Regions:
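Metal-dependent phosphohydrolase cores
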Residues: 1-147
Length: 147
């Protein structure tokens, strides 16, 4: 009679291997996240503008105007950081799950810098901004609930 124990353990080990690979990718992203902000041409702009952004409501007209003043640094930042939808020609549709998870963690941490920050409001704003599908939006919301 067939005993599934061996095949099941083999499968469990294989899944564990793949999860460990993703764990390595996530660890690398954590180490390198936004490192480009620490060097020219981004650092000078972020030194000047970040304190202003922290006092503004995310997504407000004033926030958008302030971002517009950073375009050179932002373009460099987006080009060098694939957790931003702007990095890709087709935005989020070109991202992988590691990119999306880093993006979500970035949005959560950024929302905490604003005096009136709220990750759920940020998700709503970014849902419209980046054309996030209902299904992905719900997955992002479910994931934020874990933090």
């Amino acid at each position: 009679m067939y005993d599934s124990t061996y095949d099941t353990r083999k499968h469990i080990n294989r899944v564990g291997l793949y999860l460990a690979i993703f764990q390595g990718f996530l660890s690398n992203r954590a180490d390198l996240h936004d490192a480009s902000k620490l060097l020219p041409p981004e650092k000078e702009t972020f030194d000047r503008v970040t304190p202003l952004l922290n006092d503004l409501t995310y997504g407000s007209d004033e926030y958008k105007e302030t971002l517009a003043s950073m375009q050179g640094a932002l373009q460099h930042h987006y080009a060098n950081n694939r957790h931003h939808p702007e990095h890709f020609e087709h935005g989020i549709n070109d991202m992988n799950l590691i990119d999306v998870l880093e993006m979500l963690c970035d949005w959560k941490a950024a929302s905490e810098r604003h005096s009136d920050g709220d990750i759920y409001k940020s998700l709503e704003i970014n849902r419209k901004r980046f054309g996030i599908s209902d299904q992905l939006y719900q997955i992002l919301k479910n994931t934020v609930d874990m933090l």
